[in-house]
Amino acid sequence: MDKENAGSSGVGGDSFILFEAECSDTDSESPAQGESTDEDLLDNATAVPGNHLELFQTQEKEAGERQISILKRKLCLSPCSADSEVEQLKSWACCHKYHTSEANPVVRRRLFERGDPGGANTPVNHEADNFSPSGLQVQSGENRWSQEKGKGGVSPVPSSAEPNMAACIQKLFKTLYIASHGEITRVFQSNKTVNHQWVILAYGVSEVLYSASFDLFGKQCNCLQTSRKVHEKGSISVYRCMFNVAKSRDTVQKLMTTILNVTAGNLLLQPPKIRGLGPALFWFKLTLSPATLTHGTTPEWIQQATNVASNTGEAAKFDLGTMVQWAYDHGFTEESKIAYEYALCAGSDCNAKAFLASTSQARLVKDCCTMVRHYLRAEVQALTMSGYIKRRCDQTAGSGSWLSIMNLLKYHGIEHIQFVNALKPWLKGIPKYNCITIVGPPNSGKSLLCNSLIAFLGGKVLTFANHHSHFWLAPLADCRVALIDDATTACWRYFDTHLRNVLDGYPFGIDRKHNTAVQMKAPPLLVTSNIDVHAEEKYFYSHSRVKPFYFKEPCPASDNGEPMFSITDADWKHFFERLWGRLDLSDQEDEVDDDECSQRTVTCSARNANDIN
């Protein structure tokens, strides 16, 4: 059949289908264009589980590690970091151990671990509180910060970590011993300050060295008390030492590091508090423990604080009269001397102990000194010259010879009887005989004779250099005799113009500082000078008021430069006892009968009638 007549044939449809298929579009058209795709949305096959959950967990883990890395950026150090950075971080890691909660387990890991052989560093996720820098080995036990190459020793602690180390030791001490380190010790700022007693805290001392240290320290201490307690964070050894000689912190530190084999960073050294009941009770209670080792006697400050008799009653009250009586009996008239000597009596005197506890010590010392001077001044003024000399002789110990004085006078050509006759009215203060002058060249022994006599009689020395002050004559109100050493032309001119009545021995007025002016009789006066007043016509009115003695020869000296003549208080004591009658001094037995009030003991405090003086 041809193509032209195909469509008009009425026989079958096969030829039609083939004819139409051949007349379709090009073969490049998709064969599935006219077909439906709805069946692709449904899958009736068995479902296979995928990895989407694992992928999600991996992504969350990577995000968490990135956040941790950002958070620890200031602390993350690789093993290749500089050693200085690791050393600076080491102190933080050591001290941070004590601040970790005990409820959480302590985990120590390296921040960077070696990964593949290529050397890539893989960050490890761990707790930030349990961080430890790479290269630092943290151990539990005593030597927590020891290095692997060490053999039981403690590694040196950097200087920047010492304050933190001290705080860690103090916290561990308070944990083990309840008491605080600051409550039982006081602070010495300087390492050079010496003291006999020291409290030493040593961290990480082995038990063997602790036992051996007690025997070694016992040879150097009068009193020793040691104790050691062990904790999971380390051990603390406590030493309370009273050394035979005073030592500084540097000296004790060197001694401890040598004996205990520890570094200076593992030691705390401070002197103990010796005042207060709390520190004394701490050491006393510590001695009751069987683990405490003691050597020697208990210090006195602990005995007094723990003594029942001294703590059951009321606290002792300070009595100023008792202090004044003590100063009067010892003859102390200087404030510094009174304060120092009375403070030394605090160990045996309850009133002195109360004085140290007072907050007005300066005022009390000043009042005490003022009262003692009042008593002594009144007592001296109540005595006659004979009684005063007798009292000075009784207060002088030892024996001497009056010949040393006579030999000096004989050396200068002065008759003994002439000097004694001039001394007799001089002691009585008779007008026109009240001033004796020793005149001579330098190094003739003038000051030797006069100063020894004034020292024996307890007189005062006036200095003309202070004559511009209104109060330079004030010492004359508190003495029985006085001396002006090495009077110059200006001094003689001043006396000849203003103080002729003092040379005479008549009453005159004295202006005293912070007191009203007082009128009194001029005491006997000694003057040494290189100027002969009697040879000067301008001092004509002073000739009758001054009794001169001339020392014309220079005083001989030994090979060592010391003077050949030596005069002591004992020599003057023997001089007055030998010439008592010739000096016309009164008999003391008659004076006792005439004036019993001046001879009785002065009572400066309110004593009980049954007290023994």
Curated annotation (Swiss-Prot):
State if Ubl conjugation is listed as a keyword: yes
Top enzyme class, one word, equals: isomerase
State its location(s).
Host nucleus
- Primary residence: host cell
Q: What Enzyme Commission number(s) does the record list for this chain?
A: 5.6.2.4
Record-annotated disulphide pairs: none
Query: What residue spans carry the Polar residues bias annotation?
Result: 131-144
Sorted keywords for this record are: ATP-binding, DNA replication, DNA-binding, Early protein, Helicase, Host nucleus, Hydrolase, Isomerase, Isopeptide bond, Nucleotide-binding, Phosphoprotein, Ubl conjugation
Where is the motif (Nuclear localization signal)? 72-74
GO BP annotations, alphabetical order: DNA replication
Q: Is Isomerase one of the keywords? A: yes
> GO CC terms on record?
host cell nucleus
Which reaction(s) are listed as its catalytic activity?
A: Couples ATP hydrolysis with the unwinding of duplex DNA by translocating in the 3'-5' direction; ATP + H2O = ADP + phosphate + H(+)
Chain positions recorded as ATP binding sites: G440, P441, P442, N443, S444, G445, K446, S447
Identify the stretch annotated as signal peptide in this record: none
Q: Which InterPro entries match?
A: Helicase_SF3_DNA-vir, P-loop_NTPase, PPV_DNA_helicase_E1_C, PPV_DNA_helicase_E1_N, PPV_E1_DBD, PPV_E1_DBD_sf, Rep_E1_papillomaV, Znf_lg_T-Ag_D1_dom_sf
Q: Which Pfam families match?
A: PPV_E1_C (PF00519), PPV_E1_DBD (PF20450), PPV_E1_N (PF00524)
Task performed by this protein: ATP-dependent DNA 3'-5' helicase required for initiation of viral DNA replication. It forms a complex with the viral E2 protein. The E1-E2 complex binds to the replication origin which contains binding sites for both proteins. During the initial step, a dimer of E1 interacts with a dimer of protein E2 leading to a complex that binds the viral origin of replication with high specificity. Then, a second dimer of E1 displaces the E2 dimer in an ATP-dependent manner to form the E1 tetramer.
Tell me which family the UniProt entry assigns to this protein. Answer: Belongs to the papillomaviridae E1 protein family.
The protein, known as: Replication protein E1
Q: What organism is the protein native to?
A: Odocoileus virginianus papillomavirus 1
The lineage, from the top, is: Viruses, Monodnaviria, Shotokuvirae, Cossaviricota, Papovaviricetes
Gene coding for it:
E1
